[in-house]
Amino acid sequence: MAKKVIAIIKIVLPAGKATPAPPVGPALGPYGVSSVNFCKEYNAKTADKGGLVIPAEITVYDDRSYSFVLKTPPASVLIAKAASVEKGSGEPNRKKVGSITKAQLEQIAKVKFPDLNTQNLEAASRIVEGTARNMGITITD
C-alpha cells in the first residue's frame, strides 16, 4: 500500500547552505518532519552547485517521512550570473543593466528545459529571453 501524501512544500534555498532556521524550520515543523535531517540531505545533494539557489519540492507523508526533488535554479538567477549583475533593473523598459549573448541564452534554456512547460528548445529559449527582457538585460548576437 502506498503512503498517503499529506503535504507538498516548495522551498528555495541556497545550494549547500541550508540551515534548520527559517525558512526551513517553519515550513517543515507543522508536519513533524526533522528539519535538521532535511538540511543535511539537501546540503549533500547541492554541495557541488555553490553560489546558486536551488528550489526543492518536498513531499511529506502521513508517517512523517518525506522525499524531495531538486529543481533547476530560477532563470533569473542564471541570467543574472551570466550577465554578471546582482539583480535586474527596477525599470526594465528604460534602464538596461547588462547583456548576454544568444549562446549564453541557449545554454540557460538547456539548463532550464526539464522544468519548463515546453517540449521545444526554441520555445524554451524564448521563455528565457522574455525573463531576461523583464530583468532589463539585452540579448546580443
Swiss-Prot record:
Recorded name of the encoding gene? rpl11
Q: Entry's InterPro entries?
A: Ribosomal_uL11 (IPR000911), Ribosomal_uL11_bac-typ (IPR006519), Ribosomal_uL11_C (IPR020783), Ribosomal_uL11_C_sf (IPR036769), Ribosomal_uL11_CS (IPR020785), Ribosomal_uL11_N (IPR020784), Ribosomal_uL11_N_sf (IPR036796)
Write the record's keywords in alphabetical order, separated by commas: Cyanelle, Plastid, Ribonucleoprotein, Ribosomal protein, RNA-binding, rRNA-binding
Subunit and partners = Part of the ribosomal stalk of the 50S ribosomal subunit. Interacts with L10 and the large rRNA to form the base of the stalk. L10 forms an elongated spine to which L12 dimers bind in a sequential fashion forming a multimeric L10(L12)X complex.
Which coarse location class applies to the principal site listed for this UniProt protein? Answer: plastid
**Per the similarity annotation, which family is this?**
Belongs to the universal ribosomal protein uL11 family.
Q: Name one GO cellular component term.
A: cyanelle
For this chain, one GO molecular function annotation is: large ribosomal subunit rRNA binding
Q: What does this protein do?
A: Forms part of the ribosomal stalk which helps the ribosome interact with GTP-bound translation factors.
Where does this protein reside within or beyond the cell? Plastid, Cyanelle
Where exactly are the transmembrane stretches of this chain? Answer: none
Name the UniProt record assigns to this protein: Large ribosomal subunit protein uL11c
